[in-house]
């Protein structure tokens, strides 16, 4: 993903990896965005340099100059794993895009950003295609892993692009969604115009190539399943199944309760505001556990809808949503709410990112047709269709947005 590994000319790491969520380079990325300008960054990087790999490399140059002088190549963590297996140092366009080192306009490494940071572009590894023979297992790796010598490495990707691959999400208008502790909406587009430098990130999707500029628009929601888990942990003896059963007895809109589920830290889609969780409009003479359970599921679903509206306002089409058969998408209330509000179906697949990556290793030269057919035939579990009583969901969502806006206004 967006971390940094640096090695010397012997291929030995020069320091511990700086992982994706390490925030030490935030100020560096923000200053670069300010000096380089929004137009250049958004038209060519589709992102702010932010706290990503290039900015982390600049941090090493500024704070650990003796280490920086010894760098032979920088890599993403996934590139380093491939190197340890094959002995070959290389990367992909997809990986460079996740490090915000890819120029979409010129379709090459963003050497101008490296130049701005004072980083020699020769430190960038050789670029290989995402679906290609990227090296083979060598003897030492074979002894340590049990993999046979000569087994080729033919695929690599970050977690969200790979999750999208596992869910058969490749084309404009297709969306991969996940609803664990946090939520992720990953929408595919061929439109490289964006005005969202912070709320949305853009990465070259796994099938991005010279002939197919497939971009993944990534929006994260910190407060998702953690909200429902918190309710379960504070409801004595309740399982998710019992909670869902009680929630299903409550009408759409939870009789006026709104749960604003943003209690897992600052939310990027709220411009990094940390507003916490709010349970609004409780009537102590009327509302029950079932109301709380349903309003929590609806509140999380409404936050997904809020995120999708941000994506749609930034040139993303949303024609179908695909998700794994786990976590929040096992809840009919949650899935029906999202499907009905967005007006499109949600397809549920019995797969994981690990299965997707294993299958992708058999894809060469971007020939994805048979790969996609197998997913559709073998993994599809069910489809949630938009319900006919959409107005009830829209009324509840409108009330939720009003409650959210009131909280945001008070945070100014």
Language-model segments: residues:
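Hydrophobic or amphipathic alpha-helical targeting/insertion segments
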Residues: 9-12, 31, 35
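A conserved helix-loop-beta module that forms one wall/lid of the active-site cleft
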Residues: 117-132
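Short, charged/polar, Gly/Pro-enriched secondary-structure boundary elements
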Residues: 12-14, 192
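Short beta-strand to alpha-helix junction loop
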Residues: 103-105, 130-134
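N-terminal cofactor/phosphate-binding cores enriched in small/glycine residues
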Residues: 1-5, 11
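Active-site core segments that coordinate phosphate-bearing ligands/cofactors
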Residues: 26, 33-90, 95, 100-111, ...
């Amino acid at each position: 993903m967006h971390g940094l590994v640096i090695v010397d000319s012997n291929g030995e790491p020069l320091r511990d990896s700086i992982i994706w969520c390490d925030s030490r380079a935030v100020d560096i990325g923000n200053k670069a965005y300010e000096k380089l300008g929004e137009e250049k960054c958004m038209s060519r990087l589709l992102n702010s340099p932010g706290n990503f790999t290039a900015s982390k490399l600049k941090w090493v140059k500024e704070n650990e100059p003796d280490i920086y002088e010894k760098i032979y190549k920088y890599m993403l963590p996934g590139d380093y794993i491939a190197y340890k297996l094959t002995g070959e140092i290389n990367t992909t366009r997809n990986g460079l895009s996740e490090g915000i080192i890819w120029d979409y306009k010129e379709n090459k490494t963003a050497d101008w950003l490296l130049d701005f940071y004072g980083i020699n572009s020769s430190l960038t590894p050789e670029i290989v295609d995402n679906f290609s023979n990227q090296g083979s297992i060598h003897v030492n790796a074979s002894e340590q892993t049990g993999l046979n010598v000569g087994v080729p490495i033919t695929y690599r990707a970050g977690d969200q692009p790979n999750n999208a691959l596992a869910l058969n999400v490749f084309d404009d208008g297709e969306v991969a969604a996940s609803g664990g502790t946090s939520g992720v909406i990953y929408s595919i587009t061929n439109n490289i115009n964006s005005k969202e430098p912070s709320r949305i990130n853009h990465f070259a999707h796994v099938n991005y190539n010279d002939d197919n500029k497939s971009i993944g628009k990534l929006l994260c929601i910190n407060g998702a399943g953690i909200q429902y888990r918190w309710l379960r942990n504070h409801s004595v003896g309740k399982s998710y199944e019992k909670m869902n059963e009680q929630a299903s007895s409550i009408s759409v809109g939870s009789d006026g309760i709104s749960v604003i589920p943003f209690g897992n830290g600052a939310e990027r889609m709220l411009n990094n505001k940390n507003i916490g969780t709010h349970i609004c409009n409780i009537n102590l003479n009327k509302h029950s556990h079932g109301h709380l359970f349903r309003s929590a599921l609806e509140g999380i679903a409404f936050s997904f809808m809020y995120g999708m509206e941000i994506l749609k306002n930034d040139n993303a089409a949303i024609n179908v949503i695909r998700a794994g058969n786990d976590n929040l998408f096992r809840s009919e209330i949650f899935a029906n709410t999202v499907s009905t509000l967005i007006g499109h179906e949600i397809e549920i697949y019995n797969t994981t990112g690990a299965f997707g990556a294993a299958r992708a290793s058999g894809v060469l030269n971007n020939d994805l047709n048979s790969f996609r057919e197998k997913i559709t035939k073998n993994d599809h579990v069910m489809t949630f269709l938009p319900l006919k009583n959409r107005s009830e969901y829209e009324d509840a969502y409108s009330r939720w947005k009003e409650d959210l806006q009131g909280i945001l206004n008070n945070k100014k």
